[in-house]
Amino acid sequence: MTSTPLDKIRNFSIVAHIDHGKSTLSDRLIQTTGGLTAREMSAQVLDNMDIEKERGITIKAQTVRLTYKAADGETYILNLMDTPGHVDFAYEVSRSLAACEGSILVVDASQGVEAQTLANVYQAIDNNHEIVPVLNKVDLPAADVDRVKAQIEDVIGLDASDAVECSAKTGVGIPEVLEAIVTRLPPPKGDPNAPLKALLVDAWYDAYLGVVVLVRIFDGSLKAGQQVRMMQTGATHRIDKVGVFTPKATDVEYLGPGEVGFFTASIKEVADAAVGDTITDEKKPTAEALKGFKEVVPVVFCGLFPVDAADFEDLRAAVGKLRLNDASFTYEMESSAALGFGFRCGFLGLLHLEIIQERLSREFDLDLIATAPSVVYKIKLRNGDEIELHNPADLPDVMQIEEIAEPWIKATIFTPDDYLGGVIKLCQDRRGMQRELSYVGSRAMVVYDLPLNEVVFDFYDRLKSISKGYASFDYQLEDYRAGDLVKMSILVNSEPVDALSMLVHRSRAESRGRGMCEKMKELIPQHMFVIPIQAAIGGRIIARETVRALRKDVTAKCYGGDASRKKKLLEKQKEGKKRMRQFGKVEIPQEAFIAALKMDED
């Protein structure tokens, strides 16, 4: 196979908000160009995971090489990078965009521009991409093409007069989309004779091949038998085989400049293939590395514990396997007095956390308890040291702390203006600070600064219920700001439960504490003695609920008569209960943990 001339290659990604039809459009492009036969075609070809198909979201970015005979009679190679639309997987988007020269912006003709449309388009603009707007779902009765074109021009500032109109579902307008890719997107640049310079876009683990590495070649060429070096890690590998996805893996002789493909080199761990690294030839290295990506840092942490302690080793094996495919997921062992052994895991956001939990229970058949999600706090100590806190239970003594800083985000929310009041109230309740408010037709766009701590709990669910599901939400991390944060502990029978401790803002502590205590009271079964459930900040109790004791009627045998006999029996019972309370252990059922952590705070 000879290398394709650069002017016959187009590398592009498809960016859009969730549910605007990216994956369906990808399916149509693959079908139209003959990437798969009609028999092999299935809905959402590029969404390999069951969870992706069920939730209708794309999690891992995928890549496909399409061969297209254009109207000018020439044959072009189109490399499509499918990207996720959800905010948690923004790092997947940034990787795909760095490997392309152009983007197709898909906007639902009935919904219009949404929050994540904006976030992803701005990423594409930052990468100096040529952008072709495509209006999808024009066959829907609710489609309003002119309104959406005006929105694209007003909100994003792109000229939408020649936007391509299509319906990925029915196949209308797909040939026009392919023509627009060829005529309006630029070809890649590159020198086939220069030393090899390739960008490592992604890596995943395959049971047979070991680690499969997805690359975009900028200069030089890559072929089997070549000795290559990773510039970031310094590791060297001998390439076993080189290929492309059509979307089936197909071996090729070599990859030239501008091409996107994969190679295997018996690399043992995905961690050895750092995403964003530059790959070059060991004998003839390139002088400078490519601009990589920002290091992905976990934003939300939570503890995962097996319901049955005997499953701990299975959980260890499962998180290890997930880490092979998802370098942004981190974990370390931790033990809790209440829940036993488990792992403290780091995620990119709440959806990421939910997906990993679901994959653990579905693919590895594990029953898990997740502790309350918390964010990373920066703590300045009196002696001048700074530490990062991942687990609220590990907070140092209050007397040593100078200040606690928490992460803040910039949240962009699009909502129909009927629900604007409720959305603003929600943001204000969560200590938000309004930055701007503007209208796009009948929809409002509000931008707020919010503490991430207030968002990770249940902000997204509340936003969806306030707006009847119409609001869309996107966020970027801004900075760390000092705040009046306190550690709230939950005590059951005067014993602190480490898995339920959390850092909260002082102004919210009382309501959060009361809610937790009420929830626990409903779920802890009655014992033979009274059980106080308390929320405390340091030594000060801020909320209390009591689980009443079960009581045996000890005076039932006394027929009539002597009051002192009854009194004696009651006193004896009282003494026994007092002793029981002193030495009795309260078993907290698993569902009490799960419910307390899922607590909604209306």
Swiss-Prot record:
Domain of life: Bacteria
Catalytic activity: GTP + H2O = GDP + phosphate + H(+)
EC identifiers of the protein: 3.6.5.n1
Membrane topology listed for this record: Peripheral membrane protein
GO process terms (BP): positive regulation of translation
N-terminal signal peptide: none
Keyword Signal: no
Localisation per UniProt entry: Cell inner membrane
GO CC terms: plasma membrane
Binding residues for GTP: D19, H20, G21, K22, S23, T24, N136, K137, V138, D139
InterPro entries associated with the record: EF-4, EFG_III/V, EFG_V-like, EFTu-like_2, G_TR_CS, LepA_C_sf, LepA_CTD, LepA_IV
Keyword Cell membrane: yes
Listed PROSITE patterns: G_TR_1 (PS00301), G_TR_2 (PS51722)
Domain tr-type G stretches: 7-189
UniProt keyword terms in alphabetical order: Cell inner membrane, Cell membrane, GTP-binding, Hydrolase, Membrane, Nucleotide-binding, Protein biosynthesis
A Pfam family this chain is assigned to: LepA_C
GO molecular function term, any single one: GTPase activity
Biological function: Required for accurate and efficient protein synthesis under certain stress conditions. May act as a fidelity factor of the translation reaction, by catalyzing a one-codon backward translocation of tRNAs on improperly translocated ribosomes. Back-translocation proceeds from a post-translocation (POST) complex to a pre-translocation (PRE) complex, thus giving elongation factor G a second chance to translocate the tRNAs correctly. Binds to ribosomes in a GTP-dependent manner.
Family: Belongs to the TRAFAC class translation factor GTPase superfamily. Classic translation factor GTPase family. LepA subfamily.
Protein's UniProt name: Elongation factor 4
Organism, scientific name: Caulobacter vibrioides (strain NA1000 / CB15N)
Source taxonomy: Bacteria, Pseudomonadati, Pseudomonadota, Alphaproteobacteria, Caulobacterales
The gene coding this protein: lepA
